[in-house]
């Protein structure tokens, strides 16, 4: 299936996929997803933003899986950092479905950060900042955070220690994980974990929410 910039996901495909994740989107949100995918395909020829070449799989794996986490974001206008944002997942889809969020997209790769800035600009996303930095170097620029999230960061001990540190003081972390990572993450100190939630239409993919122990 083509992944050229000319390919546009249909409104029907987006609505059908979102319904399978128990998500309801407005016409405007559907249009934002369509615009986002067009920018993604254009840039993916120059910057490796996703290895997935099937637009429908991108819709399910990146957009719907990201937006599925919105039910675990506790406050409508909370401060949320997406660490290792890459192609903007999960931070930008979360912003699309929860437009009152204050979002920080943290990405150390300059080319990927430039892509993120273009998406933010073209979609007209307010209260959304792209930070070109390693997460370990951030503190007062983002603190205090209500939620730190990540889909593919790894290095869980250092990441969770940073999120719990006084200079960041994140109240919660929201992670998209494979089943083999669950035990490692739940063994980390400073956090109490909810029960993992299976991600629809996936094999051994889970959402895990942790709350910082004061």
Predicted feature residues:
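Conserved SAM-binding loop of SAM-dependent methyltransferases across substrates and taxa
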Residues: 87-100
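Conserved S-adenosyl-L-methionine
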Residues: 82-86
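S-adenosylmethionine
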Residues: 98-214
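Active-site phosphate/pyrophosphate- and oxyanion-stabilizing loops and adjacent acidic/basic residues
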Residues: 67, 92, 161
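Class I SAM-dependent transferase core
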Residues: 1-77, 81, 111-112, 118-128
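Residue-level signal for inorganic ion chemistry
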Residues: 40, 94, 210
